Amino acid sequence: MCSSDLTNPFKLEGAVERVLQNFRDRELDALVAIGGEDTLGVAARLYAEHAFPVIGVPKTIDNDLSGTDYTFGFDTAVFIATEAIDRLHTTAESHNRVMVVEVMGRHTGWIAVMSGIAGGADVILVPEIPVDFEEVAESIRKRHARGKNFSIVVVSEGCELPGLTDAEERDQFGHVILSKRGVGDALAREIEQRTGYETRVTVLGHIQRGGSPTPRDRVLATRFGLKAADLAAAGDFGQMAALHGDDVVAVPLAEATAELKVVPREWYDVARAFFG
């Protein structure tokens, strides 16, 4: 089991110099940085500012790195979230409840959209699209009017809800610690107040990030690892292994971390077609 650390060396005095010195002291030839936007952002800066021999491998359940079609970890997270939504359907229907399912996704709603579509959610809320409480409530009311006395609402933890202020606590990358925000709870309260329907919350949290990976993620991680080894052997540093279509290719770390890959409006419209 590999350990991990969210320390940002560029935020700590002397930390970058220690990274460089430790690398030299151990007589290493290359570093493979495995992670998401924060980890690979640090890797990109180390390469750009210090010619550090680093290769990137995209690992994040958020699937929000623009340089690759998919990151490994994402498929597993979607599978876990979809299974949870499937299971919550039965208790929602038997108790005539609205079930709010909060999934991970700080800046983007890939997990919410994919698991919501796969699990048959009635409303899906993502950070890319502003949340309208009344629109959500009306969708649920319409279901009840048609005799559907239960609803499943999937919401990304990073959604901006009207009136919800961010918690003060942040990590070393400047991100709000989302577990302190309570997006799912705030949304559930609003739904219950506006509709009068009993509403419950399930926060999937870190269960999405652990356990056995799906076969797709296992294969993708293996392919990324092989590509990273080839790049290191060739001395082709400052690159990230990426999936483009069915091919694993190399893309510059700077390009891969320049911007986030957000959920396109078209994907959200696919999900929206099934709302209510």
Residue ranges, per PLM feature:
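Short, small-residue-biased leader/transition segments that mark boundaries at the very start
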Residues: M1-S3
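A structured beta-alpha segment of the ubiquitous adenosine-cofactor-binding alpha/beta core
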Residues: D5-E27
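Short, ordered loop/turn segments at secondary-structure junctions
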Residues: T7, G36-T39, V57-N63, E128-V131, ...
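Acidic/polar active-site rim loop that often engages polyanionic ligands
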Residues: V57-Y70, E93-S94, A118-G119
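Short beta-strand elements at the ligand-binding edges of bilobed clamshell
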Residues: G67-V78, S212-R218
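Catalytic, metal-anchored helix/loop core of enzyme active sites in primary metabolism
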Residues: E169-R181, I207-G225, A229-A233
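Phosphate-binding loop/pocket of nucleotide- and phosphate-handling active sites
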Residues: A186, Q239-G276
